[in-house]
Design a protein with these regions (language model features):
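Zinc-dependent deaminase catalytic domain
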Residues: 1-136
């Protein structure tokens, strides 16, 4: 979890820094990611980190880690993802589809006025897909 928190510091988003680390069953790092602008796009434009533009330009840490693994030909089947913020519904779908079998993250605030609905849906999907959730 410490590595996920450290990775989150690479994000240029001043309001939300999220890091993700994917490991195999022996805790070997398979991939890492943080929330940020897609590779090749200009990440020095400040407005891209402000609402509402950030929702259009920013990729989440979990998907960045999954995409990096795919780009490098790394299989994620039966792996574990450590995240310093619980995943949204979009990232939960990516986690399930990539074959990750365990999510380790802080407990989500399911009453959050914006993200609560995402957290609830993420938990529901992860449980249905038999992805283990471990709260830290």
């Amino acid at each position: 979890m410490e590595m996920a928190s450290n990775t989150s510091e690479w994000s240029k988003d001043k309001n939300r820094k999220v890091g993700a680390v994917i490991v195999d069953s022996d805790n070997n790092v398979l991939s890492i990611g943080y929330n940020g602008i897609p590779r090749g796009c200009n990440d020095d434009i400040a407005s891209r980190y402000e609402r509402p533009d950030k929702y259009l330009f920013t990729e989440h840490a979990e998907r960045n880690a999954i995409f990096a693994a795919a780009r490098n030909g790394v299989k994620l089947k039966d792996s574990i993802i450590y995240i310093n913020l619980f995943c949204c519904a979009d990232c939960a779908r990516a986690i399930i589809q990539s074959g990750i079998k365990k999510v380790v993250a802080p407990s989500p605030d399911i009453e959050h006025p914006i993200w609560g609905v995402h957290f609830k849906a993420a938990i529901e999907m992860l449980e249905e897909a038999k992805v283990e959730i471990k709260y830290m």
